[in-house]
């Protein structure tokens, strides 16, 4: 048993999609979340800068005495997860392998699509992980650089957003049977993405899949929070506007949250 919180980091609000799933599956666990919205999105940035920023977020979470860190950002996972996991003495999870595994299980026709930031797509990490498990599957990857900024701005269902999603995803329509949402921001656009891709395409939320791995590791290391540990005190931090973060966060999590601005 370990009553310390689980730490989550992301380039912005996208990691809240993972938090929402954790609150649903593991409602007794406490959360500390840091979103670097001031420097979002990470996708277009060079790898060394992503590495530097991610380590800053990790070190911030370590000051909060977390028992586990979840890199709830596909771009950061692709660039620096292995390094962070190797250097810390607490469990560190990324969101890519769980998403790849889930896509393989869901694909009926062996044609998997991956959408993500330019860095995630450029890294080719999803194709590698999928082919490590099943080399016969076809993988089509597409960078969607405009999606995360739309989510960060709170434009989740505007006509402009719908047009951008349609025009961006058009090359994949009719070509895949499963689509990995390879950025934790993208589930906030899920209804629009599903509408564009069609009802038969399975959408894979890499962040939500990650929560199953969190549960496994909590049990394996015997660090579940005690059921009698007292009330939960979730803490949310952002490097940008706490008001904007709270507005998106409360809409997505369907509960009131307290958000604090921090400088890194």
UniProtKB/Swiss-Prot annotation:
Binding positions (substrate): 10-11, 42-43, 74-75, 184-185
Pfam families tied to this protein: Asp_Glu_race
Catalytic activity of the protein: L-glutamate = D-glutamate
Pathway: Cell wall biogenesis; peptidoglycan biosynthesis
Active-site positions on this chain: 73 (proton donor/acceptor), 183 (proton donor/acceptor)
EC number per UniProt: 5.1.1.3
Annotated GO biological process: cell wall organization; peptidoglycan biosynthetic process; regulation of cell shape
Keyword Cell wall biogenesis/degradation among UniProt keywords: yes
InterPro entries: Asp/Glu/hydantoin_racemase (IPR015942), Asp/Glu_race (IPR001920), Asp/Glu_racemase_AS_1 (IPR018187), Asp/Glu_racemase_AS_2 (IPR033134), Glu_race (IPR004391)
Matches recorded under Gene3D superfamilies: 3.40.50.1860
PROSITE patterns documented for this protein: ASP_GLU_RACEMASE_1, ASP_GLU_RACEMASE_2
Keywords, ordered alphabetically: Cell shape, Cell wall biogenesis/degradation, Isomerase, Peptidoglycan synthesis
Superkingdom of the organism of origin: Bacteria
Gene Ontology MF term list: glutamate racemase activity
Function text: Provides the (R)-glutamate required for cell wall biosynthesis.
Family in the record: Belongs to the aspartate/glutamate racemases family.
PANTHER family found in the cross-reference section: GLUTAMATE RACEMASE
This protein's name: Glutamate racemase
Organism: Streptococcus pneumoniae serotype 4 (strain ATCC BAA-334 / TIGR4)
């Amino acid at each position: 048993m370990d009553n310390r919180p689980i730490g989550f980091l992301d380039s912005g609000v996208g990691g809240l999609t993972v938090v929402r799933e954790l609150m649903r599956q593991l409602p007794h666990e406490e959360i500390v979340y840091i979103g670097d919205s001031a420097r979002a999105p990470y996708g277009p940035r060079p790898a060394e800068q992503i590495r530097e920023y991610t380590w800053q977020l990790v070190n911030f979470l370590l000051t909060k005495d977390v028992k586990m860190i979840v890199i709830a950002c596909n771009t950061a996972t692709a660039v620096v997860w292995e390094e962070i996991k190797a250097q810390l003495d607490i469990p560190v999870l990324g969101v890519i392998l769980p998403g790849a595994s889930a896509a393989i299980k869901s694909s009926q026709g062996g044609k998997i699509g991956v959408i993500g930031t330019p860095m995630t797509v450029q890294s080719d990490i999803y194709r590698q992980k999928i082919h490590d498990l099943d080399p016969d599957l076809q993988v089509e990857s597409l960078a969607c650089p405009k999606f995360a900024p739309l989510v960060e701005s709170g434009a989740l269902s505007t006509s402009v957003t719908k047009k951008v999603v349609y025009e961006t995803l058009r090359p994949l329509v009719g070509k895949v049977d499963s689509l990995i949402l390879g950025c934790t921001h993208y589930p906030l656009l899920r209804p629009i993405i599903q509408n564009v891709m069609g009802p038969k395409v399975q959408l894979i939320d890499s962040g939500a899949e990650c929560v199953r791995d969190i549960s496994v590791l909590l049990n394996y290391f015997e660090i579940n929070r005690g059921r009698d540990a007292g009330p939960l005190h979730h803490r949310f931090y952002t490097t940008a506007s706490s008001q904007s973060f709270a507005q998106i966060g409360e809409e997505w999590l369907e509960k009131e949250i307290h958000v604090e601005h921090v400088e890194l």
